[in-house]
Amino acid sequence: GTEVVVDQQKTISALLGASPGASTAAPITLNVLKQMFPQQFNSPEWQSRIHAIVPSYGQKLNGNVALTQQVWDDTAATLQLTKPPVIQMPAAAPTATAKPAETPREASPQHDMAL
């Protein structure tokens, strides 16, 4: 992973570790901004700008099918890619009903055959 390191005066930061690829560059950049400029980052003005750039910022995509689909569609449109497939979530599996306990049969002797 990549670690963001910031000096105490918040005048310089560095990334340590593997070089970030495209899939991690945006989250790491946001993390650098958050650590370097914590007061500004949490201000309504910055939050508004961040959400304008990354509308799903601060929201979990896992388990949120509608938001995930929206992010996929928006990304594909912005990058002029083929629209991604619609996420089809299977219907909730029916809960298993408990079966009555089986009556134990007489145990038959088991023979262990060593070869």
Curated annotation (Swiss-Prot):
Keywords: FAD, Flavoprotein, Oxidoreductase, Tricarboxylic acid cycle. Residues 88-115 are annotated as: Disordered. Pfam families: Mqo. Pathway: Carbohydrate metabolism; tricarboxylic acid cycle; oxaloacetate from (S)-malate (quinone route): step 1/1. It catalyses: (S)-malate + a quinone = a quinol + oxaloacetate. Residues 90-101 have a biased composition (Low complexity). It is an enzyme of class 1 (oxidoreductase). Its EC number is 1.1.5.4. Its cofactor is FAD. GO terms for molecular function: L-malate dehydrogenase (quinone) activity. InterPro entries: MQO. Residues 102-115 have a biased composition (Basic and acidic residues). GO terms for biological process: tricarboxylic acid cycle. Belongs to the MQO family. This is Probable malate:quinone oxidoreductase. It comes from Klebsiella pneumoniae.
